[in-house]
Amino acid sequence: MTEKENSPWVEKYRPTSFKDIVLDPTNKEIMETILKKNYFPNLLLYGPPGTGKTTTIINLVNSFQEKHGQKNQGLMIHLNASDERGIDIIRNQINQFVNSQTLFKKGTKFVVLDEVDYMTKNAQQALKYLLRGIDGNVRFCLICNYITRIDESLQNEFMRLRFNQLPEKDIIN
């Protein structure tokens, strides 16, 4: 059996292209506008577990990179903040990635932070200060289930998009 055949159902059928993702009309329009324009804002996706936040952002970043000739895994870092919740993840991994020079790699860097609602308040503050000190070549995409656990001043640095459970008819079709 192949690796895909042994994968859990959710992984086996996870969309691998942005065009295959089912979203509510408002979020779909916003995401399509991001792809059409040459501007990718810092995004904060929030909502209940299992609503497609992570799949959407990974596919959106990949589609954006492809459209702009920047498809390179070295330009994106994807971290789960529930694994490393403290300030060290900001000081070490993220800061190092953001400030590293990319030889032979041109394009926008993307930092995707999943489960940000599990980060400590100090780590959230450090992230806010890092955001304010970077150039326009880096975009942050935060994902969380509970937006109330995210410092409001950090929220204000992002375009916020709420993800809700889709009606079953939308998922099946």
Residue ranges and their predicted role:
Residues 1-160, 164-170:
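P-loop/Walker A NTP-binding region and its immediately flanking N-terminal helices
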